[in-house]
Amino acid sequence: WSYQISPMAGGTQSTATIYSNEDLGAEKVRLVFRRHTEWGQSVFLYGSEPGLSCAKNCRVSMTFDDNKPITLDGSIPPTGEPAIFIEEDKKFIAQVEKAKSVAIEVTVKGKPSSTLHFDVGGYDATRFQPLPQK
């Protein structure tokens, strides 16, 4: 995991990031936890062009450790970045805090689906800065 706090677009952003074990296309995919003072909290996968495929609103299937797969709401950003947002961010982060690994099914535009594996066991919630109270 890599943790960072930096100024960004009219606020401060705190991120926790880890790369997938596998390459997808030209590079590995990042799993990003982000808290921004203006935008709030979000969780997303960030890849490379041509980007990850998902309907405007979709369901993302994932498996934490050896548990049964679960499906969470997902979406693509309207700005066109090669990303998929996990809309149920609190639920996802709560699962990561208890897990050693997560396998997430994704589709790259124009290709069959694949599974990305992330070794999330070293996640340190104390290094992912909370948002200030409004």
Residue spans for each PLM region:
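A generic "folded-domain core" signal
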Residues: 1-134
